[in-house]
Amino acid sequence: MAGSLSEIKAKIISTEKTSKITSAMRMVSSAKLVKSEQAARDFQIYASKIRQITTDLLKSDLTTGSDNPMLVSRPVKKTGYIVITSDKGLVGGYNSKILKSIMDMIQEYHAAGDYEIISIGSIGSDFFKARGMNVAFELRGLADQPSFDQVGRIISQSVDMFVNEIFDELYVCYNHHVNSLTSQVRVQRMLPISDLVAEEAAEEGVTGFELEPNRHVILEQLLPQFTESLIYGAIIDAKTAEHAAGMTAMQTATDNAKHVINDLTIQYNRARQAAITQEITEIVAGANALE
């Protein structure tokens, strides 16, 4: 009985230590989430402005007949997917949701050689490589608050692959941050930009432009920046969802630890009470035997 009591006590102490760790990790994730949400709000100021300029320019008559490759829809022979996952675990179902979605899409719509994956995050990179899938580029070790300098190269490489017709359309697959408890899987087409033209075509209120030096030069510079801003915005959004998932997972782990501690404490008290009762019974029996 003494051995059982000591084992239960050791489990209680161990679980309490684990609870303190998960509670601290929840607080860290919470702080990261606040910073990421602020970064996302700040970025939206820039993103909304460049979107407005781009869509107004694309809707204007000045862009009619543009041959810019980023605007041209062509027969789809190969598709590119930028897949954003985390570099570490302990984020609940954050990674499994996005990986299941991309696997379902590839199995349903693609043969072995007609897709390319650009993987952001170690979990996704390891997952795809373990299955022998087509990974063109990968980026590991993404910062908690990723700067454009950190991700700019892989974004530019992805856009260049479309422009150079290595693939004919580009999607970004990521978890969209809704709130601290919820995220949604998004598979968003980024290239060609013809989707954006169709979405905005019915809206009124085109801003007038005086274009210098000319339309062609402006589009050559603006469209890559616009597309890169959309992809970067998705990365920020995904990182925010990751921090929220980490916070929720650690809160759940802390709550579960508390339940385990409570159950173990009840078990310990019952075992201790049984041990005391047994000792009293043995003492009384011994005293009666001496009479």
From Swiss-Prot:
Q: How does it sit in the membrane?
A: Peripheral membrane protein
Q: Which PROSITE patterns does the protein's record reference? A: ATPASE_GAMMA (PS00153)
Q: What HAMAP family does the annotation carry?
A: ATP_synth_gamma_bact
What keywords tag this UniProt record? ATP synthesis, Cell membrane, CF(1), Hydrogen ion transport, Ion transport, Membrane, Transport
The record's function comment reads: Produces ATP from ADP in the presence of a proton gradient across the membrane. The gamma chain is believed to be important in regulating ATPase activity and the flow of protons through the CF(0) complex.
Alphabetized GO MF terms = ATP binding; proton-transporting ATP synthase activity, rotational mechanism
GO BP of this protein: proton motive force-driven plasma membrane ATP synthesis
Biological source species = Streptococcus equi subsp. zooepidemicus (strain MGCS10565)
Q: Which GO terms describe its cellular component?
A: plasma membrane; proton-transporting ATP synthase complex
Q: Which family does it belong to?
A: Belongs to the ATPase gamma chain family.
Q: Which gene encodes it?
A: atpG
Please give the subunit comment from the record. Answer: F-type ATPases have 2 components, CF(1) - the catalytic core - and CF(0) - the membrane proton channel. CF(1) has five subunits: alpha(3), beta(3), gamma(1), delta(1), epsilon(1). CF(0) has three main subunits: a, b and c.
* Upper taxonomic lineage: Bacteria, Bacillati, Bacillota, Bacilli, Lactobacillales
InterPro entries linked: ATP_synth_F1_ATPase_gsu (IPR035968), ATP_synth_F1_gsu (IPR000131), ATP_synth_F1_gsu_CS (IPR023632)
Tell where it localizes.
Answer: Cell membrane
The name this protein goes by in its record: ATP synthase gamma chain
